[in-house]
Amino acid sequence: MAIRRATQAEANYIVQLSGKVMKESSMGYAENGVQNAYNLFMPIIQNGGYFLIDIENGRVRGWILLATDWNAVKGQVMGNLLSAYVFPKFRRSGVALDLATAAINELKALGIRTIQINVFDGNPSRILCEKLGFKPVSTVMELDIQ
């Protein structure tokens, strides 16, 4: 197993894959769609964000997108963990923990003091986030009006 920064070609491939798992990773909130993934993640990558990938025997087992951004509320640059995904075959094997830890360490090396992650309601990855020390800070609520 190796965790490393994705190449440009791998990042494009992962964005395409992300479009195919959006519904699952958002607990049904977002529809699958490669174009949706490009619209969501390419601006982040163009602004300096990048994927870390877990790769074994030439096969991607999972990924996490990390980025930094100015947070006006906190008055500081903060890290963001986005688009974390592990293929079902590799879940419960430590891949997600290894990816998240590597991403946290990379952000820490950049001098980032606070990291945020968005976890959709009902997503079991919330347990891992809490294990890593993440705490809820807000709840996004939504009302559909017809």
Outline where the language-model segments fall.
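A short beta-loop-alpha structural element at the N-terminal edge
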Residues: 2-16
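A short helix-loop-beta-strand connector motif used in the catalytic cores of GNAT acetyltransferases and
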Residues: 42-53, 62, 80
